[in-house]
């Protein structure tokens, strides 16, 4: 079973709201957020956040976190396993970027880049969510650098396949890679050109792209 098959146990049917679709990719005010949640009581015990301007937040208050983010006019909220962990406990108003799912895509030879068990980041100071925010920031910078090293054709392939998947859309918006929805018809040509020696020329790529874009 592939890494993506393990990460994506279900098919995502993401509906993108019109306000997010219209978001200016040049507006890049970002904050990094991490929570410490009790394993038994499933309650938030601590919250850490780090804004693009260097300001940090460290207390277990959703209300105070919202104020901190609003003061920074935050557009993007980034974290490690943010979408399927932290966002379940927090009411986050922003475009979400999750570094967890980008890692196997951009670092295929070391897919658990900067990761440890339970899908959390290694931290010099364990159980310190602010420190985890710093690590998430470092990982995002690495992922952006890796993205920029990809060929233009490969970036097109990843964007066309993944831009409507919630685990990837925020990142693709942040780097200004979103394509028009009807551009998906071009993905077969790009894939056959990029992987011509590794894929059957008769493969039904449109069907695969529709059924399992992450797996493809």
Residues of each region from the PLM?
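N-terminal accessory regions of nucleic-acid-interacting proteins
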Residues: 1-28, 214
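A short catalytic or substrate-binding loop motif that flags glycine-/basic-rich loops and adjacent residues
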Residues: 25, 39-42
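Sequence-level motif detector for i,i+2 pairs with an aromatic at +2
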Residues: 27-28, 94, 182
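Two-metal-ion RNase H-like nuclease active-site motif
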Residues: 28-38
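Conserved DEDDh/DEDDy metal-dependent 3′-5′ exonuclease domain
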Residues: 41, 50-147
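Short aromatic-glycine-enriched beta-strand elements
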Residues: 45-47
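Short, intrinsically disordered, charge-balanced linker/junction segments flanking boundaries
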Residues: 79, 90, 204-216
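Acidic, Mg2+-coordinating catalytic module of metal-dependent nucleases/exonucleases
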Residues: 115-194, 200-202, 206, 213
